[in-house]
Amino acid sequence: LVAPLEFGPADGGTAASPTQWRAAPGGDVVLSGGTRLSGWTVAADRWTLQLPADQPLFSLLFVNDQPRYRPRLPQTGAYIIAEGLDPTPANRDRGGDQFRYRAGDLRPDWHNRDDVELVVFHQWNVSRMRIASLDEAESVVHFTGPTIATNYWAMPLTGHRYLVDNVREALNTPGQWYLDSRTRELTYLPLPGETPENTVVVAPRLEQVLRITGDPAADQLVRHLSFDGLTFAHTNWACPPQGNSYYQNEANLSAAVAALGLQDSDFTNCRFGDLTNHGMSLGAGCQRVNVERCVFTNLGAGGIKIGTTDVPADTRLHSGWNVVRDCTFSHGGRFHPAGPAVWIAMSPENLVEYNDICDFYQMAVSIGWTWGYDESLAYGNRIAHNRIWDIGQRLLSDM
């Protein structure tokens, strides 16, 4: 795709005659937000390719239907923050923007240092920050922007772990890749047995591959629309200049399939995979949407987001009464570790049942967006008969 596939109210059907999009019998239909790369120059241990000017920067590369990662430091384990520091005056009321590192862990002479990202693990969320400057004398790193809040759970604290991502000097392991943003040269270190002839390499371009956009506040809904047997793949996400940090569940991130005002509709036998963000978002006004027998795998963040983070005064904007049944969620949080398999925000009466959920770093199913006694729409949700295992894995400290 050169742009997301878009549907609006005029594209829906009726209860008697729903609009159906199905894979042809025996067909393999992939809606891809990426571009297959070819024309590699092959050397002894690496392939190189000059990317065109219109190819956006990307954070994951997909090789033979598997995510491949940029070089990071340390190559195993994590670095430890030597000392958490108060924010600088510019961000005193906004969030953390610096910490003291152990001497030698960070270097000012890294190639394209502005492209290096610090992945800071908090209690239940993760901040991905860019480097503004390094004070070698004091061993202090300053970010280009603050974390999401000054609360303890959003600050880079003493003893917290962090990774350094996208370091060209660490490129030494088969399966890794590095894109030089200045020269636009992509370098890939192939795994044993991989050749340009037997290897499909896809660079993601689009953040979304399918957008379904109604306007529930104006009673303009998309209804009776169904998708069967389709694959949604190869979405992109790039760290913004100020970094990325959010409260919980990677809730601010986009999804490969995003819907507003979608009702009485179905996703059946679909695959959501090889993504840098979430799989699906059922936002404001999405009601009675059934997601059944679908596979969500190799996810950059989470699987499905349902609802909104506020309580809309206009009840037409409420999302709920949806079903997630007999689906498989696996290998999530591969780039944004705090993404859960299923997140129900301010949304009532949803049913999540008979799903297999495994290999996520955050919760399998998260419900709600209220930390206290304020009004919540997250009532009447039923979570039943799901098989859940290999969750948390001690990556985030609350799991």
Residue ranges and their predicted role:
Residues R223-H234, Q263-N277, C286-A301, D314-G333, ...:
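Right-handed parallel beta-helix
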Residues P4, E207-V209, A256, H278-G279, ...:
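Structural detector of coil-to-beta-strand junctions
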Residues E6, R22, V30-S32, R211, ...:
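Extracellular beta-strand solenoid repeats
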Residues L253-A258, T276-G283, K305, T309-R316, ...:
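The substrate-binding groove and active-site-proximal loops of carbohydrate-active enzymes
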Residues L1-G261, D266-R271, P312-R316:
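Extracellular polysaccharide-degrading/modifying enzymes targeting complex plant/algal/animal polysaccharides
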